[in-house]
């Protein structure tokens, strides 16, 4: 199954990592979503790429310095907990890519995934090898993926972490890299492609998924073969 991943939802059209953004991605044809998780001052799992609210919500406040109640108030309830996303969106997509922005709360994330019975739908991804190693120590079966831009030996690192996915910045991955990954039983999801031309190019290179801010680009790919839809 080819993964059409809504990057932070459909952030080209809605505010990133909000319910509106995730639902828009699904409406536009995404069969997977990607989101980012941080932890609040009171230990709640918050869906946000940045640790500061300024860029998205215009408030110069760090998530790690605020409680969930304070964050909800400052964002007019638009900021979400991971629990809210999993309960609302979890059964409406084939996969949810949960990016750990920091290490130290892997157990909380896994507990919530198990609580919502979404173990088969989640891929935990991160730039942080220590976070992925901790996830694997805690759960031998859940899928994980190593995110990277430039990396000398990503396949070796992913295999050492017992990960199933490589999640590279698309500009730094080539057809031969994808073929090598597949030979090592690793799947490849590239980020972030917003051009129809580039999406076609990387599908031709045999990637297993594309993360995009514009999930509607997949609808325009009339040359996608049936087994890649």
What do the PLM-derived regions correspond to, one by one?
Residues 1-60, 77, 112, 121:
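Conserved N-terminal beta1-alpha1 strand-loop-helix module at the mouth
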Residues 14, 98, 124-125, 190-192, ...:
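Conserved SAM-binding loop
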Residues 15-19, 79, 83, 103, ...:
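Non-membrane alpha-helical structural segments and their capping/turn regions in soluble enzymes
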Residues 19, 23, 87, 133, ...:
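Alpha-helical segments flanking ligand/cofactor-binding loops in enzyme cores
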Residues 30-31, 140, 206-209:
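Alpha-to-beta junction loops
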Residues 42, 49-150, 161-164, 168-170, ...:
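Metal-dependent phosphodiesterase/phospholipase catalytic core, i.e.
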Residues 72-79, 146-229:
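C-terminal active-site rim and adjoining tail of enzyme catalytic domains
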């Amino acid at each position: 199954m080819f993964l059409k991943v809504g990057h932070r939802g459909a952030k080209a059209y809605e505010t990133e990592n909000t319910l509106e953004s995730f639902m828009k991605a699904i409406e536009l044809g995404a069969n997977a979503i990607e989101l980012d998780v941080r932890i609040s001052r009171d230990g709640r799992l918050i869906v946000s790429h940045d640790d500061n609210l300024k860029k998205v919500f215009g408030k110069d406040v760090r998530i790690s310095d605020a409680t969930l109640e304070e964050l909800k108030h400052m964002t007019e309830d638009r900021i979400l907990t991971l629990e809210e996303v999993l309960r609302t969106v979890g059964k409406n997509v084939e996969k949810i890519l949960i990016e750990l922005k920091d290490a130290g709360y892997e157990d909380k994330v896994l507990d919530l995934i198990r609580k919502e019975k979404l173990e088969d739908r989640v891929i935990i991804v991160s730039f942080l090898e220590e976070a992925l190693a901790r996830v694997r120590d805690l759960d031998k079966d859940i899928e994980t993926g190593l995110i990277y831009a430039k990396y000398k030996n990503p396949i070796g690192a992913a295999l050492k972490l017992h990960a199933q996915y490589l999640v590279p910045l698309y500009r730094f991955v080539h057809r031969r890299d994808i073929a090598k990954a597949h030979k090592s039983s690793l799947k490849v999801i590239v980020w972030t492609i917003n051009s129809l031309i580039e999406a076609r190019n990387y599908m031709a290179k045999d990637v297993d998924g594309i993360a995009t801010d514009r999930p509607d680009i997949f609808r325009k790919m009339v040359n996608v073969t049936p087994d890649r839809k």
